[in-house]
Amino acid sequence: FKENVFDDALTTASILLLAKDKNSTEINISTIESKLDLQKVVDYTNSYPKLKGEFTYKPSDLDPNIKWRKYYQVQNSDKYKNLVPFSKYAKVVRGIATGANDYFTFRPSKAKEFSIQSDNLLPCVCKAKDVKKAFFTSNDFKELEKNDELTYLFDAVKSTNSAVEKYIKKGIKEGISEKYLTKSRKIWFSLENRPPAPIWVSVFNRNGLRFIRNEAEISNLTTFHCVYLKQSDLFSSIDTNLLFAYLLTDVAKEIFSDNGREYGNGLNKFEPNDLNKAQVLNLSLLNSETVDNILKLYRKYKEEQDKVYIEQLNEIFISKYSQTESHTYLKFAQNQ
């Protein structure tokens, strides 16, 4: 379906037509543009097994490990060559889950109210709305502190401070220690081990993924996923700025969109493994001259925040990685 047909369904809907017979040589897939096209379901049922769908496959053609949209939608990645899994360069994991944000998150005023010192407060971005630009700096964080936004997590392990102990007792009294996530921990008020990630990526979006360079080197809640670069493999390691320059482009967002989860009203969601398994351009194939040019444009964008530099970066990647439209791409395009 390409529009909301079932009001109670938040995700993309599909109707499966199954027959108890021996006709198992083909699987037919069709798309429905609107509610008016629901008549197709009746037509397929009445004419079964003669009428074919828009796309026909043998069961052996289908890979259960990939998203099925590959079999009925144009894949943006088909327009590009030399693709590799994002996991070649980075690992994506979710942000810190506290199990009780109201208890664990602190504003400066709340810290003062409960006499919690900085030693027991972990600097953290708690809400997506607090990150407005592609680069999040120490000055941005200080501005959030100044505006008394949620900027810390309660970090009490190994503390003997009386104010901390009092706040822990408050959590027990209010039942925080018995919540789903907290009660499963050895120490209920301990935080998940998530070192600050150099790059964050939005979980929900309507206009493509949003990547943020975490220059403040602080932690984040689940409003963002953490992107950690792989450095263990000499041949797979990549310069953080080069990767981030690519992630800022429409080319990157376009290819990533193949692996997202579609919700109602244009909302998309990406789980960590959706991103880990997604395709990216093989940046290791770029020559040193091109890399220098990319990094020069990246620095200019960082300084001036002018999107003209992003457009120029986009053109570089298109010129280096575009390929003649594949047979697969043309096949789907003709059915749109």
Each PLM stretch: what is its role?
Residues 1-101:
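Signature of N6-adenine DNA methyltransferases within the class I
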Residues 1-4, 26-37, 60-63, 209-221, ...:
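Short, surface-exposed, charge-dense and proline/glycine-enriched linear segments
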Residues 74-296, 307-310:
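Polybasic, glycine- and aromatic-enriched phosphate-binding surface used to engage nucleic acids
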Residues 249, 285-336:
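Amphipathic alpha-helical coiled-coil/heptad-repeat segments
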